[in-house]
Amino acid sequence: NINFLKGIDSVRNLAYSTTRSVRGMERTSFSTFERVNYLFPVDEEEVSKIEYNFKLENKTHSVNLFKENYFELLSDSEVRKMMGYSNKVRECDEMIDTEFMNLKIDLDGQELLNEKYSEYDRFATNGKQETKLINTTLVSSFKHVYDDFYLSKVLNNVELYQEMLGVLIEFDEDIIGLNVDSKGNSAWRKRYMILSKNHKEAIPLELYGDGMKKAILLMSAVIASKNGILLIDEFETSIHTSAMNKIFSWILSTAVKLNIQLFITSHSKEAIDKVLKCDPTLQDKMNLYTLYKKDDSTLTRKLSCYEAIEAMDDYDIEVR
């Protein structure tokens, strides 16, 4: 939606949604300044740029994000005011070298947004309006390796918790339940335990294989993304082919149930085939997009689920 780009919330959503899955940045205490800085490549240039194109109603649009960092001397009182602590001006103020950032968003050469942020804008918002964050979750292909899950949402939903256990039987047929180790939690992360018929005591989830951890990560991420957007990179990694149908079917059906827009990527022909065919009742809700290079451009080919299956099965066309 082009109008969405014009809103100040678009910047906060972009910064928050893109960095919330980064280790240590899931806390909302990080400022927009810190998150926007993280979006751009680290280089020696003072001005950084992100550019992308998209097609809407047969018209190609170009979006450019420009970031420029610079420093200004501010008094200690001004800094404290920016942080929301005090409006009082002190008689002897220390001067502080403060980093600022100008962020501009252009659409087709026309300026949509021009905002200024400071490293001390911890709590400030434009015009005291409340930021409307879109519930967006990004799952990288290796996130399960760090035992980083979204299980707090799962444990608060009895119905989906039971459904998830039914799927996890594919990895451990003796699994009984999953809970939080109240003694083993740290300030940054909860420790989760698996109850199994094979063991007298609960086993830490981190001791299980990558397949179990990846399945739990994907399913918990779906539940955490209710009424939002879920992006999964290389969704099939660490999932054995024998378990793909059940897991993918649950993910897709639950995404529909919870009103989630789901984007998944893969380079695996077998995984793409599995996800397209795992639940025929959902095939009218799926599209396959293939990115490919032509000359100096990256182009997109869109196929419906039915077209993609026909292309693979009847004509042996490469859809990856």
Please tell me what each predicted stretch does.
Residues 221-224, 254-256:
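Phosphate-binding P-loop
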Residues 229-231:
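Walker B motif beta-strand of ABC-family P-loop ATPases
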Residues 246-320:
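C-terminal lobe/lid and adjacent interdomain/linker elements of RecA-like ASCE P-loop ATPase modules
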Residues 5-218, 223, 292-320:
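Phosphate-coordinating catalytic segments in nucleotide- and nucleic-acid-processing enzymes
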Residues 2:
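Walker A/P-loop
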Residues 233-235:
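Walker B catalytic acidic pair
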